[in-house]
């Protein structure tokens, strides 16, 4: 089964919400995140590198107001990619996905616009 590698670089978030931030300048077909990561106690930033296309996707999730300098490796399979893409699509078109809402962030320094899905 096809898998992608994801590296969690650091963790910093508010205590009451978790968010997933997607850099929409990247090809959505290569977007991936492991849903089980939501079970981890400290997650803030995940970089996913697709070596075949040389693309890098930056995601953000978290649960705690903590800063942890640590790294973990995740394996992400195609089923998990499709599940998270369905969640994002459902939220984006306004379908009910309990506990989630869509937000658009101010363009970053490099001019890309981020889409943020807040998990409350």
Where are these regions (language model features)?
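Positively charged, low-complexity terminal tracts
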Residues: 1-120
